[in-house]
Amino acid sequence: MKLPIYLDYAATTPVDPRVAEKMFQCMTMDGIFGNPASRSHRYGWQAEEAVDIARNQIAELINADHREIVFTSGATESNNLAIKGVAHFYHKKGKHIITSKTEHKAVLDTCRQLEREGFEVTYLEPAANGIIPMERLETAMRDDTILVSIMHVNNEIGVIHDIDAIGELCRSKGIIFHMDAAQSAGKVPIDVQATKVDLISISGHKMYGPKGIGALYVRRKPRIRLEAQMHGGGHERGMRSGTLPTHQIVGLGEAAAIAKAEMASDDARIGALRDKLWNGIKHIEETYINGDAIERVSGSLNVSFNYVEGESLMMALKDLAVSSGSACTSASLEPSYVLRALGLNDEMAHSSIRFSIGRFTTEEEIDHAIEVITQSIDKLREMSPLWEMFKDGIDLNQVQWAHH
C-alpha cells in the first residue's frame, strides 16, 4: 500500500493509464501530432479525425450532438464562456442572473465581474442539506432574468441538485440554464435529450483525463447564442479560438468513453467504499456528515469532527491526502464558504474534512484510513481543553472568552 493514501479525488484525479497511452500516440513525430486546422496534408487530416472521434465520445457521454461540444482549457474557462457569453449576448433582453452561494469560485467570481459591468446577480441560500429549494429559485426569477447557473454536484459536500426540475422551471420561464458539471460528468448520468439544460461545463482532470482541457456543451435546439471571450482564428465555430491540443482532446475523449462504459460499476464500488469509510468513523463522538446524506455523489464524504481544529487534524492525518475544503481555496485560512452557507458555525466549518474516493481507491486503503482517523481524533481531543470542557457539560456557546 502506497502512503500517503490519495483521498482527494474531488480536487483532481490521476490520468487513467488507458487515457495516457492514447494521448502519447498524439505527441511525437511518428504519432498524430499535426494541427487539426491544417487542411492541406495528411498530418492535419489525421489530427482532425482524432479530434472528431473525441468530440463524439464526449457528446455520447451526455447524449448530445457532436456539434454541441466546444473545447476549452477546463471547467473554469467553460464557466466563464457560458456565463459571460450569455450575459453579453442577451444583455438587451435583461441583466439579471441567478446563482447560488455554494457554487465554485469560477462561477461566483465570474458573476462578481458581471456585477461590476452593471448586471444584477441573486445569490440563493441553500437549505441546511446543501440543496437549493425549488421555491427559492422560482421566487428569485424575474422578467429580466436571462440566466440561471446552478452546479450539478457540489465540489465540497458532493450533494446532487435535481437538474430535471431546475431545467423544467427555467424552460417554462424562457430562462437559459447553465450547469457546472465538473464534479458530475462521467460520474452521474447526464442526458441532454431528457433534461432541459442549455449549457454544461465539463472538466477533463476530474474524470481521469488530463489537466488543461475541458468542454462546454452548447444546446442547438432551442439554439443558445454566446459571445466569444477568446478571439483569434475562429476555431470551435467562432466560440473559442486557439489551436486545438490534439493530445489533450484525445485524452478527454478517451476518459469520457471509459467513464460511460464503466460508470455503473465504478459508482457501485466507490459508493460501497464511501459507506465503509463512514460506517467506520461515524461512531466517533460529535462527528457529523455535511450535506444531504442521500442525494450525494458516491465518492464524496464531508465530515465535521467537533472540538478538533481542522488544520491540526490535517497535520495528524499525514498518511491521508485529504482536504479541508476545495483545493482552489484551501490556501486561505477562512472557513469554507460552502459550509458557512449551510449554517455551520466557524468551529464546525473549521473542523471539517473532505474525503473523496475514486477509481483507484482500495478496500485496504479505506481500512487504514479508518484506523488513522480514529487514532488521530482521540489523540487531538485528549490534548484539547475545549473537548474537556464539553465533556464536563459546559456549553461552549455560553462561555465569555476574555479578549487579549
Swiss-Prot record:
Active site: residue positions: C328
EC number: 2.8.1.7
Binding site for [2Fe-2S] cluster: C328
Modification N6-(pyridoxal phosphate)lysine occurs at: K206
Record's subcellular location: Cytoplasm
Entry's Gene Ontology cellular component terms: L-cysteine desulfurase complex
Principal location listed in the UniProt entry: cytoplasm
Sample GO molecular function, one term: pyridoxal phosphate binding
Keyword terms: 2Fe-2S, Cytoplasm, Iron, Iron-sulfur, Metal-binding, Pyridoxal phosphate, Transferase
Listed InterPro entries: Aminotrans_V_dom, Aminotrans_V_PyrdxlP_BS, Cys_deSase_IscS, Cysteine_dSase, PyrdxlP-dep_Trfase, PyrdxlP-dep_Trfase_major, PyrdxlP-dep_Trfase_small
Positions of pyridoxal 5'-phosphate binding: A75, T76, N155, Q183, S203, G204, H205, T243
Pathway: Cofactor biosynthesis; iron-sulfur cluster biosynthesis
Catalytic activity: (sulfur carrier)-H + L-cysteine = (sulfur carrier)-SH + L-alanine
GO process annotations (BP): [2Fe-2S] cluster assembly
Family to which the UniProt record says this protein belongs: Belongs to the class-V pyridoxal-phosphate-dependent aminotransferase family. NifS/IscS subfamily.
Protein purpose: Master enzyme that delivers sulfur to a number of partners involved in Fe-S cluster assembly, tRNA modification or cofactor biosynthesis. Catalyzes the removal of elemental sulfur atoms from cysteine to produce alanine. Functions as a sulfur delivery protein for Fe-S cluster synthesis onto IscU, an Fe-S scaffold assembly protein, as well as other S acceptor proteins.
Assembly and oligomerization: Homodimer. Forms a heterotetramer with IscU, interacts with other sulfur acceptors.
This protein's name: Cysteine desulfurase IscS
Organism: Shewanella baltica (strain OS155 / ATCC BAA-1091)
